[in-house]
Amino acid sequence: MSAIVDIIGREILDSRGNPTVECDVLLESGTMGRAAVPSGASTGSREAIELRDGEAGRYNGKGVLKAVEHINTEISEAIMGLDASEQAFLDKTLLELDGTDNKSRLGANAMLAVSMAVAKAAAEEAGLPLYRYFGGSGAMQLPVPMMNIVNGGAHANNSLDIQEFMIVPVSQPTFREALRCGAEVFHALKKILGDRGMSTAVGDEGGFAPNFGSNDECLSTILQAIEKAGYRAGEDVLLALDCAASEFYHDGKYQLAGEGLQLSSAEFSDYLATLADKFPIVSIEDGMHESDWDGWKLLTDRLGKKVQLVGDDLFVTNTRILKEGIEKGIANSILIKINQIGTLTETFAAIEMAKRARYTAVISHRSGETEDSTIADIAVGLNAGQIKTGSLSRSDRISKYNQLLRIEEDLGDIASYPGKSAFYNLR
């Protein structure tokens, strides 16, 4: 039995310099698991609640000492002595201890830190790499990365309303080659921006954050970077967007301030369809406001056969909401953010529900990250097929890519890279 004998929560800093929660779980054998949780900037209203202290004089109210205290007292008492290999039972214990629908009492940040640290300790105890502990012998597929090379919206201080402009390398035989492709395009884009006298400062997720005149101009510039790096846009490298539309939806209109547009749901659906016709866009995330289900239905009917339509704020990694979306034919993919739901067991349930409905599942980081690379192991362990973990700069992003390189090396000849087949529900 891998009995838990000690649990230590602490406050650390994330990639934005804000406090977050880290947890150590020690087992009877002396094995330890350590995990740190991320935090988002643009968040869905139905996400599990991360507990912040709210003391204005300390970290601008963003301290997490209350969450840490919950780990070191209530949670510690509840799970001390439990078997770390019983992940589902342990997560159930956490849920019952919290007793709320949205984890607002203990805090999703406290609960997730413990859930992840327990899994890491159990994997170490079993002598297994984390991805293998999660997925067993079937874990052998590396994910296709969506690399956020231009940041806008809430992730940058510029004129772009769309939050993320991403490249998706799909023709490469291995993850290692896909990563090289992404890095080469990133550096080609930096050279193009520099030659134009545009900013090469980076945003929260490591992408550039220049002031483009329009979304068209941004996408066209990315195509130039792909070609400059020696790749073919639409063949070797596809494009993806995260609109984060909830951030610019006001008074019933999609207000693209950077382009001076105020659009209805139908008009914004047309706008996105026009972009998808003009550019090799394979995926659009949060193309409508999280509560605009009629708009989502319009967009799905319009583009759902040819473009991956990812629900992030829409589904918030919640099986109850995802089930409703599947029944209503809304979107065709779910973004998986572990801190949106707060335990590994619930995260894995959302991935499995999506797969059964032939929705794709995209494992994702948050804009506020740490060096913790657990999401890389989740992506491989659950054969998710896709991952979003930022650009080709900032060590909080690169740590996930480097972990995927290690996993691919560990898998050896049985490793596979799906490329375009990761988008299996498109025609």
Curated annotation (Swiss-Prot):
Biological process terms in GO annotation: glycolytic process
Catalytic activity reported: (2R)-2-phosphoglycerate = phosphoenolpyruvate + H2O
Enzyme class per UniProt: lyase
Pathway assignment: Carbohydrate degradation; glycolysis; pyruvate from D-glyceraldehyde 3-phosphate: step 4/5
Species whose genome carries this gene: Burkholderia thailandensis (strain ATCC 700388 / DSM 13276 / CCUG 48851 / CIP 106301 / E264)
Protein name: Enolase
Subcellular localization: Cytoplasm; Secreted; Cell surface
Annotated residues for binding of (2R)-2-phosphoglycerate: Q163, K337, R366, S367, K388
